[in-house]
Swiss-Prot record:
The lineage of its organism: Eukaryota, Metazoa, Chordata, Craniata, Vertebrata. Residues 24-35, 306-319 have a biased composition (Polar residues). This is Protein HEXIM1. InterPro entries: HEXIM. Residues 97-111 have a biased composition (Basic residues). One of its GO terms (molecular function) is 7SK snRNA binding. Residues 1-22, 49-61 have a biased composition (Basic and acidic residues). One of its GO terms (cellular component) is nucleoplasm. Residues 185-202 have a biased composition (Acidic residues). The keyword Cytoplasm applies. Residues 1-111, 157-223, 262-286, 299-319 are annotated as: Disordered.
């Protein structure tokens, strides 16, 4: 009130006092303006109606009606929306700081398939890689002086089963199989004899699962036969049509040859005294040799005898 009275009726002696009051009022207005510029939306995220930029002019006394609940002017609503947009941008930049790293799938995709879906060639390549890796690891362990166990594989089972299977290529298979098997016959015979002696001494033994040895052998043989059958079916599925036809023709030839051999053996068993057996054929050969010798002697005698009117040995007498 004193300020208003002094402004209405100023005196000459109080000019300095009036100037000081005006400067204090201006400084209080600047402080209020700075407080309004710090928008509470930066802290709480809500849009405050009193937020405005520094470039906006100071609100007049007539504009205070909008703060009392009455609708504000268009300029004030526009300023509020701009302030809210600025505040939200500031909050997002302040909270995130830098661009968020989005994880993307790697370009180097690992093409992995389960083992039962692999083809025969892929399985073979996988086994070869695993064998090479195992041998490399074993070599490293051996170089470090650590104990090394042999590489665990079941390939020897397939090799033994292939030996027992008949060779379908009868013409070439006999020579190759004879050359290959001749190396291992002695060692295999010795192993079989040793196993038979052990079984006789131990009374049959067991397979380690509480069953007798014979039952365990039958179970293992059945299991192995099923596994080998699955392998054979898979091999046939991977063959082309021409390969299947060729395989079928070879099997037909082999079956016809085996049927002929079977019929011949049955005939020999039914008629043991027939010339089809080994002793009869040997006797026939001996007789043929004797006939050849007699013919040679006859020819020599014909050459030695002089040409005369007397008939020779083989000359027919005139009738």
């Amino acid at each position: 009130m004193e300020l208003i009275k002094e402004e209405t009726a100023p005196e000459d002696d109080s000019r300095g006092r009036q100037r000081d009051c005006r400067t204090s009022v201006v400084s209080s207005k600047q402080v209020q303006r700075n407080q309004l510029e710090i928008c509470p939306g930066l802290v709480s995220g809500d849009v405050h109606p009193m937020c405005r930029d520094r470039s906006d002019p100071e609100p007049r006394t007539g504009d205070a009606a909008s703060d009392d609940g009455f609708p504000a002017d268009k300029t004030s609503s526009k300023r509020d929306s701009e302030c809210a947009a600025v505040n939200t941008d500031g909050v997002s930049d302040g909270r995130q700081g830098k661009k968020k790293h989005r994880r993307r799938p790697s370009k180097k995709k690992r093409r992995w398939k389960p083992y039962f879906k692999l083809t025969w060639e892929e399985k073979k390549e996988l086994d070869e890689r695993e064998t090479a890796r195992a041998s490399r690891v074993r070599a490293e362990m051996f170089a470090k002086g650590l104990p090394v166990a042999p590489y665990n594989t079941t390939q020897f089972l397939m090799e033994e089963h292939d030996r027992e299977e008949p060779d379908l290529n009868t013409e070439l298979g006999g020579r190759k199989s004879g050359a290959i098997r001749s190396e291992d016959t002695a060692s295999e015979d010795e192993n079989f004899e040793a196993e038979e002696d052990d079984e006789e001494e131990g009374g049959g033994g067991s397979d380690g699962m509480g069953r007798p040895g014979q039952a365990g052998g039958e179970f293992l043989q059945k299991d192995f036969s099923e596994t080998y059958e699955k392998y054979h079916v898979e091999a046939l599925q991977n063959m082309s049509k021409q390969e299947l036809v060729r395989e079928y023709l070879e099997l037909e030839k082999c079956m016809s040859r085996l049927e002929e051999e079977n019929n011949w053996l049955r005939h020999v068993r039914r008629n043991p005294e027939s010339p089809a057996d080994g002793t009869g054929s040997q006797r026939v050969r001996e007789l043929e040799v004797e006939v050849e010798k007699l013919r040679a002697e006859n020819n020599e005698l014909l050459l030695k005898t002089p040409a005369s009117n007397e008939p020779g040995l083989n000359q027919s007498q005139p009738s």
